[in-house]
Structures are given as structure tokens and as C-alpha cells.
Amino acid sequence: MEKHLVMYLTRKSIMLLRKYLLVTEFQVSKCGSHIVKIRRDVLYPKRTKYSKYSKCRCSRGREPDGTQLGFGRYGTKSSRAGRLSYRAIEAARRATIGQFRRAMSGQFRRNCKIWVRVLADLPITGKPAEVRMGRGKGNPTGWIARVSTGQIPFEMDGVSLSNARQAARLAAHKPCSSTKFVQWS
């Protein structure tokens, strides 16, 4: 059954999912074909069940999923619950890659791997400036990802401890939530 689900995906979407999220084919088939690449390298859902969602609260407690390092030796762990915009996720990813390229030059393409474990899948709505109250919620303007306390949004491997710590420090300045560096033991 899993093979049939993978057949519905285009080759490009599977390649993008495996390149940027580094997931297996089984996870891609569970995810479906609704994730596409747009606006440089930002991934977000092509369509959702509803076009507008309520804000909801970010969970303050620790969740079992995503609180342990799953892929790499180093990572960043969120210290508190919050929301990450798709722009902040992409900026943090680019800052990490830029740090590795400056520090490692030729070794970057051979050894280094970065995993982004959050996906901005909730639309944010907004109304234009100087519009009167009422008349609906507003049009979707961007995408966010909910991050709970203790969740690991970024992981990295194939680099030295000092380079990973420096890259995590640079990436922590991009999102609005506080993070700390974690190491696999």
C-alpha cells in the first residue's frame, strides 16, 4: 500500500522532501503530495483542509515527539513554546549553512548534513492597513510552525563541536524564541 501512495507524488516533490527534510519514502507517503517548494527554498503546504485556522495556544508541556536527537550529533532545542514563521526557519537554515561554508569550505559538501525538523504548516491571516473592523478574518499572509518546549527544530552532523556550536548560536538569533545547544551523548 505504501508503494501506491508514493506513486501519486511527483519525482520533484519527493526529491525536495528528501533533500530539505531528509525523510524516508514511508514518511513521504504518509505526508502526501501537498508539500511543494516555493519562494526560494521554503516548503509549505499546497492546500489545507481549511484556508484559515484559529490561533490556538502553543503547548507548554513537553511532547514526546521531537524532543530527542534523531538524525544528527548536534542540535538546537527550544527553551519555551512559541511560533516560528517560515521566514525565520529559512533564515536560520541559511545562517547555519553559511557558517559551515565559511568554516569548512570544501569539506561542507562531502561531510555536513543539516536536518530541519519543523514545517510551517499553519496559515497566518492579516488585514491590510487602515481597514475598518469586521467583514471577516482577512487573507492568509504567511505560514507558521508551532514549536513546543523541548522540541528540536534543527539538527546537524559531520562537523566539529566548535563549528556546530557557532552555527547554532547564529541560527538562534533568527527565530524569536530562545534555544539552547544540545549534543548527542
UniProtKB/Swiss-Prot annotation:
GO BP: mitochondrial translation
Compartment(s) where it occurs, according to its Swiss-Prot or TrEMBL record: Mitochondrion
InterPro entries: Ribosomal_uL16, Ribosomal_uL16_bact-type, Ribosomal_uL16_CS, Ribosomal_uL16_dom, Ribosomal_uL16_sf
Name this protein carries in UniProt: Large ribosomal subunit protein uL16m
PROSITE patterns linked to this entry: RIBOSOMAL_L16_1, RIBOSOMAL_L16_2
Family: Belongs to the universal ribosomal protein uL16 family.
Organism from which the protein derives: Zea mays (Maize)
Major subcellular location class: mitochondrion
GO molecular function term, any single one: rRNA binding
Gene coding for it: RPL16
Cited CDD domains: Ribosomal_L16_L10e
